[in-house]
Amino acid sequence: MAITEDEARKVAHLARIAVKDADLPALAQELNGILHFMEQLNEVDVEGVQPMTGVEPMRLKRRQDIVTDGEMQDLILKNAPDAREGFFAVPKVVE
């Protein structure tokens, strides 16, 4: 499958990339190179290979799931135009 200059123009437009008409042949050639590489990847036999996200198994460090108040309530509420009893106060919206 080959990318034409018109298709390269359309891809550039969809990607919101400004490409001069003189640069379209080079862009089309680069896109064709990318597609050729992807076609090569499709030829690789991966039957029986387990999906993986990386070559080294890693686990995220977990912290204790402890509920806290964030210890920043006063700092946050001092930026509010109106705060009452530890909460943001806003005008009534629904009657």
UniProtKB/Swiss-Prot annotation:
What Gene Ontology molecular function terms does this protein carry? asparaginyl-tRNA synthase (glutamine-hydrolyzing) activity; ATP binding; glutaminyl-tRNA synthase (glutamine-hydrolyzing) activity
Q: What EC number(s) would the UniProt record show?
A: 6.3.5.-
Which Gene Ontology BP annotations are present? glutaminyl-tRNAGln biosynthesis via transamidation; regulation of translational fidelity; translation
Q: Which UniProt keywords apply?
A: ATP-binding, Ligase, Nucleotide-binding, Protein biosynthesis
Gene3D superfamilies hit by this protein: Glu-tRNAGln amidotransferase C subunit, N-terminal domain
Q: Which Pfam families does the record associate with it?
A: GatC
Catalytic activity from the UniProt record = L-glutamyl-tRNA(Gln) + L-glutamine + ATP + H2O = L-glutaminyl-tRNA(Gln) + L-glutamate + ADP + phosphate + H(+); L-aspartyl-tRNA(Asn) + L-glutamine + ATP + H2O = L-asparaginyl-tRNA(Asn) + L-glutamate + ADP + phosphate + 2 H(+)
Give the matching HAMAP family: GatC (MF_00122)
Classification via NCBIfam families: gatC (TIGR00135)
- Family matches, as PANTHER family: GLUTAMYL-TRNA(GLN) AMIDOTRANSFERASE SUBUNIT C, MITOCHONDRIAL
Q: Which family does it belong to?
A: Belongs to the GatC family.
Question: Partners and quaternary state?
Answer: Heterotrimer of A, B and C subunits.
Quote the function comment for this protein: Allows the formation of correctly charged Asn-tRNA(Asn) or Gln-tRNA(Gln) through the transamidation of misacylated Asp-tRNA(Asn) or Glu-tRNA(Gln) in organisms which lack either or both of asparaginyl-tRNA or glutaminyl-tRNA synthetases. The reaction takes place in the presence of glutamine and ATP through an activated phospho-Asp-tRNA(Asn) or phospho-Glu-tRNA(Gln).
What's the protein here called? Answer: Aspartyl/glutamyl-tRNA(Asn/Gln) amidotransferase subunit C
Q: What is the lineage of its organism?
A: Bacteria, Pseudomonadati, Pseudomonadota, Alphaproteobacteria, Rhodobacterales
Gene from which this protein is expressed: gatC
